[in-house]
Amino acid sequence: MSITSPPIEVSVLTDSIKNLLEKNFLRVVVKGELSNVSLQTSGHLYFAIKDSKAVLNGAFFHFRSKYFDRKPKDGDYVILHGKLTVYAPRGQYQIVAYALTFSGEGNLLQQFEERKQRLAAEGYFDPKRKKPLPSGARVIGVITSPTGAVIQDILRVLSRRCHQFQVILYPVTVQGATAAQEISQAIQFFNQNSMGVHALIIARGGGSIEDLWAFNEEELVKSIVASSIPIISAVGHETDFTLCDFASDVRAPTPSAAAEIVCKSSDQYRQELQNLRRYVSSHARQFIAAKKNLLTHWQRHLASVDFYHTAQQTLDYTRAALERGIETKLEYYKQRFAQYRRWLKSDVLIRIEKHLADLNQSLMLSIKNKIYTKKTSLNQLYTSCLKNELLNLQHRTQHSRNILSQLSRRLHIAIASSQQTHQECLVRLQNELSFTIQHLLTKAKERCQAIQEQASSLNPKNVLKRGFAQLFDFNKHFVIISAESLKQSDLVRVCLQDGEAVVSVKEVWLNNDKKG
């Protein structure tokens, strides 16, 4: 822009800068330390990300709906995926993020998968080597922190479900550099000391992947596999999986569930096995197929419009999370199904089944009625869950549509404003161009008139009009401008204003001297 260019408004300049940034920095990945973190009630996250030399402000819209399990704080090192834009009211460039990863989690997940595949190949997770839980376990070893809520949950469940039981607590730290070693030592202690323990529970509450990393150590996996006492793993929440879960004989989604599993009666095992078999065979595939068809429908519907890529991305994340949850559920129920089959094959359960076969017809009828009642309850629960999932998906879809509608309206307003601004600028430029052309034409006319006047004053014919004459030789070959070129009796052609005349030279004078 030159110095003579007309001035523009601040908003126009800001919009130009914004367009340049968004066009050239559509996708960026940046890492650094968070500061000034603010999570609003609307679910939007505002922050600044910095390193030792620079600070960049940023925003993450709808953060709470995507990362509900962990809230970032000042000082966290993160990796952001997003785009650069300009916040016009402040004239400030910022990053608008659509994905956030806590620094270190990516490397830990890669280590987890590599270690899991290697140990699985070595046979540490082989279902054939897993030990069945004894029926009616009464002496239970618990390996966990003595001060947390986990041990209290286990004791509360055991007190409610079991009339006679004994818990032997081995206190350990469940997080940190020494946690895996302490838990391994606890397992060895129970195996080396004859204390009559029927089963062991390794328990801990939920946390991030860093918090649960002790349960992914190879040392702990090998100690679990080497144990002669059956081990129940109850680490983290239901969606958390550690290598301890894969190596243990039974995996429980929570510490409370571990206490329920360890003291279940044989008729409960039988009933749950039947219910799980019906549930897995009758509903799992239908549920997965229905969800995939629904997601495919919405994906095909929204993918046809490039402008709706944000909603498409949100639906993709939702579908991936849903598929992971379904796979996790299936893996969990498969493990429980295999475990129950092993229990039913044990000698104790065979004797129980033989005894149950001898019961009278009234007892069998009562059992069938209970099974029917439970089946009806499960069907109702399944129907309710499916309706809730569908309603939740509809709400999310409607929310995405509302967002897209708002963005569309904002885009139309922005386009109209931009067109008006460009139209005003075009009118101003046309006026300036007309003025400049008119000024140049006036100057050119004045210059032409001056040249015409000068040419007119130099025209010989105009000089003749003032009483002068022009002399030529008789044949008009050349102009006579000096008396020296004349001699007596020469014929000279004289050009006047209105004609010509031929004269004869009588005498010639040069500078008052007479010649010939």
From Swiss-Prot:
Q: Name one GO cellular component term.
A: exodeoxyribonuclease VII complex
A Gene Ontology biological process term: DNA catabolic process
Q: Read off the Pfam families from this record.
A: Exonuc_VII_L, tRNA_anti_2
Q: Where does it live in the cell? A: Cytoplasm
Q: Which CDD domains match?
A: ExoVII_LU_OBF
Reactions catalysed, semicolon-separated, are: Exonucleolytic cleavage in either 5'- to 3'- or 3'- to 5'-direction to yield nucleoside 5'-phosphates
Q: What is its main location?
A: cytoplasm
Alphabetical UniProt keywords: Cytoplasm, Exonuclease, Hydrolase, Nuclease
Q: Which domain of life is it from?
A: Bacteria
What InterPro entries does this protein map onto? Exonuc_VII_L (IPR003753), Exonuc_VII_lsu_C (IPR020579), OB-fold_nuc-bd_dom (IPR025824)
Q: Give the GO molecular function terms.
A: exodeoxyribonuclease VII activity; nucleic acid binding
Q: What is its EC number?
A: 3.1.11.6
Quote the function comment for this protein: Bidirectionally degrades single-stranded DNA into large acid-insoluble oligonucleotides, which are then degraded further into small acid-soluble oligonucleotides.
What family is reported? Belongs to the XseA family.
Give the matching NCBIfam families. xseA
The record's note on quaternary structure and interaction partners says:
Heterooligomer composed of large and small subunits.
Name of the protein this chain belongs to: Exodeoxyribonuclease 7 large subunit
Species source reads: Chlamydia trachomatis serovar A (strain ATCC VR-571B / DSM 19440 / HAR-13)
